[in-house]
């Protein structure tokens, strides 16, 4: 039993390492580009994360999640409070960029 669990853990670790190796982008390890903030490539990495979280793929995933939550609520698998939490969370994720830009604007 313990042998099976340890084999599964080792397998998962190996698969995670292989996935990280395959999907890693060489541009993240490139030299700094000399941005205005002096952080170089860190700005690009953070912007890529924001784009990933609010881009087209994220909108498609959010649409599927809203539909799944709606169906779950309709059939009684999810109560209304959890459905509302899901929708509020999606609103916060997609509204974060606009909220931060309003808070940091000079006007």
From Swiss-Prot:
Keywords: Cell outer membrane, Membrane, Signal, Transmembrane, Transmembrane helix, Transport, Virulence. One of its GO terms (cellular component) is cell outer membrane. Residues 1-31 form the signal peptide. The keyword Membrane applies. The chain crosses the membrane at residues 49-71, 83-103. It is found in: Cell outer membrane. It comes from the Bacteria. Induction: During the interaction with the intracellular environment of host cells. It holds the Pfam family TrbC. Its main location: membrane. It is a multi-pass membrane protein. InterPro entries: TrbC/VirB2. The keyword Transmembrane applies. The type IV secretion system VirB/VirD4 is a major virulence determinant for subversion of human endothelial cell (HEC) function. VirB-dependent changes of HEC include massive cytoskeletal rearrangements, a pro-inflammatory activation by nuclear factor NF-kappa-B, inhibition of early and late events of apoptosis, leading to an increased cell survival, and, at high infection doses, a cytostatic or cytotoxic effect, which interferes with a potent VirB-independent mitogenic activity. These changes of HEC require the T4S coupling protein VirD4 and at least one of the effector proteins BepA-G. Homooligomer (Potential). Interacts with the 17 kDa antigen protein that is encoded within the virB locus. Belongs to the virB2 family. This is Type IV secretion system protein virB2. It comes from Bartonella henselae (strain ATCC 49882 / DSM 28221 / CCUG 30454 / Houston 1) (Rochalimaea henselae). The gene is virB2.
């Amino acid at each position: 039993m313990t042998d099976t669990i340890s084999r599964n853990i080792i397998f998962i670790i190996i698969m995670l390492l292989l996935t990280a190796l395959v999907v890693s982008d060489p541009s993240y390890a490139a030299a700094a580009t000399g941005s205005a903030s002096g952080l170089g490539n860190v700005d690009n990495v953070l912007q890529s994360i924001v784009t990933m979280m609010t881009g087209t793929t994220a909108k498609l995933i959010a649409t599927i999640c809203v539909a799944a939550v709606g169906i779950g609520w309709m059939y009684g698998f999810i109560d209304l409070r959890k459905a509302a939490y899901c929708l509020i969370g999606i609103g916060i994720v997609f509204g974060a960029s606009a909220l931060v830009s309003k808070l940091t604007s000079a006007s």
